């Protein structure tokens, strides 16, 4: 089978995919995991671009900031950044999560209410547990987003044709452009940053 999520964006592999309606419209959630972690630890990013906010915190360029953030989210905070407010809150949250997991034998995830039980999880560590909760939150949030999108598209020619983690691809009817505005509001109401592409092929070029 074809892994559509892994199609190369640069070499034209995507160009053969065309809409049944009039054009394709792709929404990508920016800095999804840092955003969700911010919600968990009650940290509000002032910047419109979260990776830019981290870039300013670290004093490094944009791409390096993305790399540093993900390394610390999944592998633990580096010594030189432990005093940054975001990571201080992340550390407090992780420690509290771990304490509850150890003392009560389980933790409940937000939104999904899924319960991770200590007795079923071997070789668990504080950072790993945080990652479990974060990825569960991503899935739960996406289910909520998809539900809202499906309600908007009910009875419409416009369809959601592909969903991959933080990306949503629509096949849009030219006469139903208003649904795009409604769908964008779904992401805005959840305070998620969005980038989008559109075009006559999946290549968007």
Predicted regions and their residues:
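Short beta-strand-to-loop capping motifs
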Residues: 170-174
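Acidic, glycine-rich two-metal-ion catalytic cores of nucleic acid-processing enzymes
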Residues: 1-60, 110, 114-150, 159-169, ...
